[in-house]
């Protein structure tokens, strides 16, 4: 009776409590496991889903799921309780922020949604699941709340051409975790970084320094911020403004035909550039601007030109940084004195000198060629004449010799005949012989010597082998004849005798 009464007093809750106590005392899990994530990441302001799914044997039931925040060093704070019979119960601290996932729902799924996550929600959470009849299970996860940065770009001080290294801009971004800040630009410069860490976030500041120049004016300087909480990098662009003023120059005098008396539409234009944009002012050195001349910004327009418009005009370019001047001399000419009709003496002189130099060079070449041809022709003529005279002299000498050899009796007493070597009537001597004639029309020594040379150069037939005996007799006759002559000063003279002529049967010797 008491036992039955006690059994009737125990309800399902008592039996469940008993099973939990038995499971806790034994320290063993009967069956099943919890599936969750070690880390859940959510961007600030978005909903975070805290997963907790019980995977057990068929027939097991999840009675209730309890969520609590269990940060290190702090006690557990109840978040919510899900009961299979009574539904969801949320603690007052998270009222309106914790919900169940939208249907359909699995009875074994104990996940909850944390709406509109804030950075304070970052921490560690525990899921405790009570099942029947397996008992209770628990698992932990960490919630990470990403705080995307909101970058800001601050321009540096005004940039001026000629400055040294100057701050162009700084870019700051704060988030959790610390963001990455870089620069995207074609401008040459250097970047420096500084970071500051707070309790729940970190700030990064990057500065970009450069040396200003006019080429940088108008160039983009972009700050690029990267962060895990951003779907794509954030970019902030700053356009550089570098103050400068370029040199001034005046154009309009290139076509001199426009600057003649009576012409219209003549104008001068002042060229310059700067930042900020410059202003233009036209003046005239030798007085005020002539009447009718109008200045409109960088342009100075002239009416119908007259000689009074001649003068020196000055264009002054100014901006907040500096000012520049440029001047030109305007000379309005009469049509008769237009540059197109004037003779450029310098150019003409250069052309004349060039033409004269070319003509002289050509003349020099012609003279050299003609002189060369003349000397060549002269040399040929002299050579030909010399050969003709030499041939004629040889022919005369040979003809004379032939006439003497053909008839010795016809030779005049005044002449002296010299025979070539090898002739039976000649005198043979290794030295040159000279014969002086005593007749009034006798020949000189030089003439006889020349004849001797010519005769010697004349080729005569050499004696053959059959005339050897004649050669010996001739030599003997010469030896006998030499007994009657004496040699003085290179001349043969007859020895004093009663008869000055020696007659040999083989020939006549003088």
Swiss-Prot record:
Its main location: membrane. It is a single-pass type I membrane protein. Residues 148-237, 248-331 form the Ig-like C2-type domain. The chain crosses the membrane at residues 350-370. Disulfide bonds join 52-127, 171-223, 270-315. Keywords: Cell adhesion, Cell junction, Cell membrane, Disulfide bond, Glycoprotein, Immunoglobulin domain, Membrane, Repeat, Signal, Transmembrane, Transmembrane helix. One of its GO terms (biological process) is homophilic cell adhesion via plasma membrane adhesion molecules. Residues 32-349 are extracellular. Residues 1-31 form the signal peptide. Residues 400-475 are annotated as: Disordered. Residues 400-412 have a biased composition (Basic and acidic residues). It holds the Pfam family C2-set_2. Coiled coil: none annotated. The keyword Protease does not apply. InterPro entries: CD80_C2-set, Ig-like_dom, Ig-like_dom_sf, Ig-like_fold, Ig_sub, Ig_sub2, Ig_V-set, IgC1_2_Nectin-3-4-like. Residues 32-144 form the Ig-like V-type domain. It is found in: Cell membrane; Cell junction, Adherens junction. GO terms for cellular component: adherens junction; plasma membrane. Glycans are attached at residue 281. Seems to be involved in cell adhesion through trans-homophilic and -heterophilic interactions, the latter including specifically interactions with NECTIN1. Plays a role in the senescence-associated cell size enlargement via SFK/PI3K/Rac1 and thus promotes senescent cell survival. Also participates in the innate immune response by acting as a ligand for the receptor TIGIT to inhibit NK-cell activity. Self-associates. Interacts via its Ig-like V-type domain with NECTIN1 Ig-like V-type domain. Interacts via its C-terminus with AFDN. Interacts with TIGIT. PANTHER family: NECTIN-4, NECTIN-RELATED. Belongs to the nectin family. This is Nectin-4. It comes from Bos taurus (Bovine). The gene is NECTIN4.
């Amino acid at each position: 009776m008491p036992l039955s009464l006690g059994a009737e007093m125990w309800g399902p809750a008592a039996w469940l409590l008993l099973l939990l106590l038995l499971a806790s005392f034994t320290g063993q899990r009967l069956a099943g496991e919890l599936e969750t994530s070690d880390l859940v990441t959510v961007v600030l302001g978005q909903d975070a889903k805290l997963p907790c799914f019980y995977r057990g044997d068929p027939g097991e039931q999840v009675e209730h799921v309890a969520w609590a925040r269990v940060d290190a060093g702090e006690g557990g704070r109840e978040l919510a309780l899900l009961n299979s019979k009574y539904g969801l119960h949320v603690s007052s601290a998270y009222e309106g922020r914790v919900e169940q996932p939208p249907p359909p729902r699995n009875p074994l799924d104990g996940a909850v949604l944390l709406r509109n996550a804030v950075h304070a929600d970052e921490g560690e959470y525990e899921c405790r699941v009570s099942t029947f009849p397996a008992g209770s299970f628990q698992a932990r996860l960490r919630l990470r709340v990403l705080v995307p940065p909101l970058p800001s770009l601050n321009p540096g001080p005004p940039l001026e051409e000629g400055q040294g290294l100057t701050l162009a801009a700084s870019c700051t971004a704060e988030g959790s975790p610390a963001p990455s800040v870089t620069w995207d630009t074609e401008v040459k410069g250097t970047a420096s970084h500084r970071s500051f860490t707070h309790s729940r976030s970190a700030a990064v500041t990057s500065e970009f320094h450069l040396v200003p120049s006019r080429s940088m004016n108008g160039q983009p300087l972009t700050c690029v911020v990267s962060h895990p909480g951003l779907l794509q990098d954030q970019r902030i662009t700053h356009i550089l403004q570098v103050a400068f003023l370029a040199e001034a120059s005046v154009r309009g005098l290139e076509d001199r035909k426009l600057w003649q008396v009576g012409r219209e539409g003549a104008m001068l234009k002042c060229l310059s550039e700067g930042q900020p944009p410059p202003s233009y002012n036209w003046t005239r050195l030798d007085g005020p601007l002539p009447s009718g001349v109008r200045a409109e910004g960088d342009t100075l327009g002239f009416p119908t030109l007259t000689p009074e418009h001649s003068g020196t005009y000055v264009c002054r370019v100014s901006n907040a940084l500096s000012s520049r001047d440029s001047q030109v001399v305007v000379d309005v000419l009469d049509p008769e004195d237009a540059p197109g009709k004037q003779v450029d003496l310098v150019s003409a002189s250069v052309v004349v000198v060039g033409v004269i130099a070319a003509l002289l060079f050509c003349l020099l070449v012609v003279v050299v060629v003609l002189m060369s041809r003349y000397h060549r022709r002269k040399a040929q003529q002299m050579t030909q004449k010399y050969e003709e005279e030499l041939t004629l002299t040889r022919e005369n000498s040979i003809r004379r010799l032939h006439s003497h050899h053909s008839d010795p009796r016809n030779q005049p007493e005044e002449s002296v005949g010299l025979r070539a070597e090898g002739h039976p009537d000649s005198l043979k001597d290794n030295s040159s012989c000279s014969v002086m004639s005593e007749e009034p029309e006798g020949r000189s020594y030089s003439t006889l010597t020349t004849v001797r040379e010519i005769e010697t150069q004349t080729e005569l037939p050499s004696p053959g082998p059959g005339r050897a005996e004649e050669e010996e007799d001739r030599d003997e006759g010469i030896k006998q004849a030499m007994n009657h002559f004496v040699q003085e000063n290179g001349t043969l003279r007859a020895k004093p005798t009663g008869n000055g002529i020696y007659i040999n049967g083989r020939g006549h010797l003088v």
